[in-house]
Design a protein with these regions (language model features):
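N-terminal capping segment at the start of a domain
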Residues: 21-68, 280, 322, 330-337
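Structural recognition of the beta-strand scaffold that forms the well-ordered cores
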Residues: 43-52, 59, 92-95, 115-119, ...
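Active-site-adjacent mobile loop/cap segments within catalytic or ligand-binding domains
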Residues: 51, 220-238, 286-363
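Alpha-helical metal-binding/catalytic segments enriched in His/Glu/Asp
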Residues: 118, 133-192, 354
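Bacterial Sec-dependent N-terminal signal peptides
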Residues: 1-23
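A non-catalytic alpha/beta surface segment that caps or lines the substrate-entry region
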Residues: 42-121
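Second-shell loop/turn segments in exported
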Residues: 29-38, 56-69, 102-107, 146-157, ...
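Metal-dependent peptidase/peptidase-like ectodomains
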Residues: 185-298
Length: 364
């Protein structure tokens, strides 16, 4: 293997010496134009508005017009509806609701679960594929049951929600053969219940979901323990062996054949890396071969559990001083998921990466 590697290097040097043409990176001009329209100022405006609602805890008020999850979801719906009016009938938006009873865990009152969904209908009647981009609009303080205290949630997951809104803003002006769904889900912090509701409905209706891009915590460039500051890398988490309809015999055969890395989720992650790095400059997409961070979860999981192909997209360096923290200053350290800790150029790149992948997938 080492000799082969040396031969490849030598051949590369040889051919470049004799004037071989450089590799040309192919881009779809229409998609490249959409990528260029992703705006850090627009993303900042989306997140500023989301933060202004004080808290977006799933258990918070739905009747107050200026505070709580109800006000936030109504604003997101208003954005989707505004884009729908300019789409020539291609985009439609709605509140997707379901009743949820107290579960003795993270829900202590009856809820009307409400996801905000915008659908860009595919132009090809024979193409039934559906691609989903998701972020969760809800957030939490240190106590997940605290529904009244301030919880800015700028990054977790204002960043993912803003990316969804921005992609809808730009992509709704175009048409694609396949259908794209933009969704801001609720109930993530309460146990992935909003995405669970959507995934279960998709399974029951036999929706042909080809891929789910779940964006969660993707807008900050620094970590609190290593002090790394880097806005050039983003992680994509993908599962190997799926728990969906996986029996022991199939698992053993997969292991015997060495096919753990051939799962649809891992193939999607590879596609995301190749496409995203082709369209977005100065961004390295790091594939992480595990479903999620250690002992963590996200809204891609309910889809995976029902047999759909899904991945999680997350910033490279997380800062736990700015996740699920009550806003405060302690021992000179500023805690809280505040907008001041966001890097909007980094979020622009990560949003553009999502858009480039959605557009290429829906046109393929």
């Amino acid at each position: 293997m080492r000799k082969l590697f040396c031969v490849i290097l030598a051949l590369g040097a040889y051919t470049s010496t004799f004037g071989q043409s450089p590799v040309v990176i192919q881009k779809d001009p229409q998609i490249a134009k959409m990528v260029s329209e992703v705006s850090p100022d627009s993303l900042r405006a989306h997140i500023t508005k989301l933060v202004s609602y004080g808290t977006r805890n799933t258990l918070s008020t739905v009747s107050d017009k200026k505070r709580g999850i109800g006000a936030a979801r109504n604003w997101i719906l208003s954005r989707f509806n505004a884009y729908a009016k300019e789409s020539g009938g291609r985009l439609t938006a709605k509140l997707d609701t379901s009743s949820y009873k107290p579960d003795g865990k993270r829900v202590d009152v009856p809820l009307v679960l409400t996801n905000v969904v915008a659908t860009l209908k595919g132009s090809d009647p024979n193409d039934h594929r559906v691609f989903i981009i998701s972020g969760h609009m809800d957030n939490m303080r240190t106590d997940v049951m605290d529904r009244t205290g301030d919880a800015p949630g700028a990054n977790d997951d204002g960043s993912g929600t803003a990316a969804v809104i921005e992609c809808a803003r730009i992509m709704s002006k175009q048409s694609f053969p396949a259908t794209i769904i933009f969704v801001a889900v609720c109930g993530e912090e309460q146990g992935l219940i909003g995405s669970g509701f959507m995934a279960e409905n998709a399974k029951k209706s036999k929706m042909e979901i080809a891929a789910v891009l779940n964006n969660d915590i993707m807008g900050s460039n620094n970590s609190n323990e290593t002090n790394i500051i880097d806005n050039t890398k983003v992680r994509v988490f993908s599962e190997g062996l799926s728990s969906y309809e996986l029996d022991v015999k199939k698992a053993l055969n997969t292991r015997f054949m060495g096919q753990e890395n051939d799962s649809p989720s891992r193939q999607l992650a590879r596609y995301i890396k190749e496409t995203g790095e082709r369209y977005v400059d100065n961004l390295q997409i790091v594939m992480v071969y595990r479903p999620d961070r250690f002992l963590r979860g996200g809204d891609h999981a309910p889809y995976q559990e029902r047999g759909f192909t899904a991945v999680r997209i997350t910033e490279m360096n997380e800062n736990y001083n700015h996740q699920h923290q009550n806003v405060r200053t302690e021992n000179g350290i500023r805690y809280g998921d505040l907008i001041e800790f966001m890097d909007f150029e980094y979020l622009r790149k990560n949003t553009a990466m999502n858009l480039s992948n959605l557009a290429n997938l829906a046109k393929s």
